[in-house]
Amino acid sequence: LAGTEASGLYESRLGREELPEKENHVFCAAYRADEFEKLLQYADHIVFNSPSQLAKFGPAAKAAGKSIGLRINPECSTQEGHEIYDPCAPGSRLGTTRAQWDAAVAAHPELPALLDGLHFHTLCEQDADALAVTLAAVEKKFADLLPRMQWLNFGGGHHITRPGYALDTLESCILSVRQKYGVQVYLEPGEAW
């Protein structure tokens, strides 16, 4: 494992304590101002859910030397039976759509300079075929941003350790993105841990 993914201050602290030499990534739908400075002590990568959170906390994270990401919403649902957890469902506030990003950049042209990576998390106990569909949607909506990024996080929900999981499809997705855009690829294989 290259590191941990946390959802807030206390998980990030635990990740730093238990795996001190590994990367510590944090995503939170909304960071709290009263905790953010402490979070900077533990996190290496900080992923924001929205352009407004990026604008509010991104400069402090960048000044602290953190790698900064934005959770994107490719608006491509692959869910069946897990719709309640689907971040791509209509009305979802998880991740930033392309239209939201474009509107935010028009109002705040300094935002793109803060970003080092993009993060999507759209799967729930799914096979690599769903990842391939989602990745195609990510490229359709966000491909022009990827060459400027250092990394792309494919998120969690990959059922990698399930018998029959299409590892060749996963490998193909990773290699394709690395070759096209020159980015490091992250996965969050939660059930494998």
State the predicted function of each range.
Residues 1-151, 173-176, 180-181:
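Active-site-proximal beta-alpha core segment in soluble small-molecule metabolic enzymes
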